[in-house]
Amino acid sequence: MIMINSPSYLEFCNISKHFPGVKALSNISFRANKGSIHALMGENGAGKSTLLKTLSGLHQPTEGELVVDGKALVFNSATDALEQGIAIIYQELNLVPELSVAENIYLGQLPTKGGSVDVETLNARAREQLKRLGEDFDPSRPLKEFSIGQWQMVEIAKALSRNAQIIAFDEPTSSLSQREIQNLFKVIRELRDDGKIILYVSHRMEEIFDLCDAITIFKDGTHVQTFDDMTDLTHEKLVELMVGREINDIYNYRSRSLGESGLRIENLEGKGLTQPVSLDIRQGEILGLFGLVGAGRTELTRLIFGAEKAQAGQIYIHGQPISVRSPQDAIRAGITLCPEDRKADAIVPILSVEENTNISARPWNLKLGGLIDFKWERDNAEQQRKALNVKTASLQQAIGQLSGGNQQKVILGRWLSTDMSVILLDEPTRGIDVGAKSEIYELIFNLAERGVTVLVVSSDLPEVLGISDRVMVMKEGAVTGELQRHEFKEQTALSLAMLGNNQAAA
């Protein structure tokens, strides 16, 4: 076993990784140097996550090797890689909320005294690790009492406690506030300056250009190009290299004829709303719902879908009042939801693409005697896969192995299998790269053109303005304004979201 100590470089030498029916990585070669934050970018499914899993010891390369300062590394497990000085900070943090901060940092290496855990030493060591990161919160308290941003610091402290010299970050800012993001960037820069080798995966281009010194671009499991200096690299060139084509207008908005009222809400009240909410969306219309964290957007979709019980108000579908006491009631009425956290609330990761596609369609295809029509399910899943261009090795592949963009397509395909007339999309492109985003937008427009009523919740303001016919803005659980398409201005929407009034238009 090689213990990595102050390495000068990490090199991926002709790395390939094959799964049954899929070449996830093909002949990947590049070098990440000490004193540089090295970005990994590509569309979802380009191979970034597979490469990190190879680096972490979760996957063994089919071909090729990892080299540090001229010496080949061999891992038999993720624990093996960590012991050799390699740590991966994943988007889904590998922590235990019920344990203390200190216990999470030193889990597996707890100091003992007299046959039991030496709590005093444990907390002192944890406090010192947090101090290195500029944090001073109490390590003896349960982790669940702290914010996601502080959880990130705990994960980094955990890596440093094991003397990690190579640290990779996989979409670390997806759940962080702007202040927490800036704090994280400060820590990452300090780690770089301290001699660590840093790899950084993100789909947010503004982060890449703000934080990173070098970049490697992937496409379809292959290495496209590495820039050791990003000075002359533009956003447009990066997108072109990622997707293999120019994307001039990622939204490609197009108007369409609208029908009668598709979804109408009158004076809806419930959890997360501070004032009654009313809205009316026509058939074929795309209504964007914008607001900052805590605005009540997600809470509103959950009330409409029956995931939270409304305290007052009335919902109408095609002008007819309906009673929604549960998601089952909503689905029967033709209301569907793609939730904000698809991994927690929308997919069953260990089940196949076929099974996830048909979860909500099964009540419509039971044979006489209560038997499931498996042929119908196979045919339906294949039909949705083709229609939505889902990239998967087979319909039997576990959905948890797919990229975020392809998971989102499967969720959309699930609802296309039902008698859907209304779809609620909560952060539909979060964690999805620019190429897959354009495909999701195209699917949204196709739904609207079929007469489906669409509500899109997004914290990405350019996205909301790019695809919506109208935009409704919320702040602290209340609607603060509505904009028609000819009124769309970022300043106006932000003013409504932050101040609760349209000062930008004054």
From Swiss-Prot:
It is found in: Cell inner membrane. It holds the Pfam family ABC_tran. Its main location: membrane. Its EC number is 7.5.2.12. One of its GO terms (molecular function) is ATP hydrolysis activity. GO terms for cellular component: plasma membrane. Residues 10-245, 253-501 form the ABC transporter domain. It catalyses: L-arabinose(out) + ATP + H2O = L-arabinose(in) + ADP + phosphate + H(+). Part of the ABC transporter complex AraFGH involved in arabinose import. Responsible for energy coupling to the transport system. The complex is composed of two ATP-binding proteins (AraG), two transmembrane proteins (AraH) and a solute-binding protein (AraF). Belongs to the ABC transporter superfamily. Arabinose importer (TC 3.A.1.2.2) family. This is Arabinose import ATP-binding protein AraG.
